[in-house]
């Protein structure tokens, strides 16, 4: 299945680039994507990197589509794909500052004033919050069914006890 994520990611890159710049640019983007050393190394492995890549590309596509055409449908597609991307790998939390930054730049690039930049940031934050509430939250709640608060606390203490930097581990209060 991870190879499938690689193939679909390549198709998304080709299609998105072709839509904006034409077929030749789409083929060039696909060529560069396919021959990137990181992609070559990870596309054949069974880990979450390719799924995360797919989630990041898909959510970025729908987020940019929402910024271009701010309809309810595009908002929900951006929020849902963001939530799904967040579920693929922990490091995809970096989509949060990325989306806020893209929203700010988008607001400035098209309107050239602070109000539009703040509005772009607000829309980005709204996509993130809705994605967490409707996608990430329910999935994590399913994992917590039957996991008592006492067991959660005991497990957290064990994990925090092994954490090397006490500056961050000690302030956790139960």
Q: Regions from the language model: what does each represent?
A:
Residues 3-20, 58-62:
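Transmembrane-helix motifs of polytopic, lipid-linked glycan transferases
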Residues 29-34, 41, 61, 82, ...:
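Short helix- or helix-capping micro-motifs
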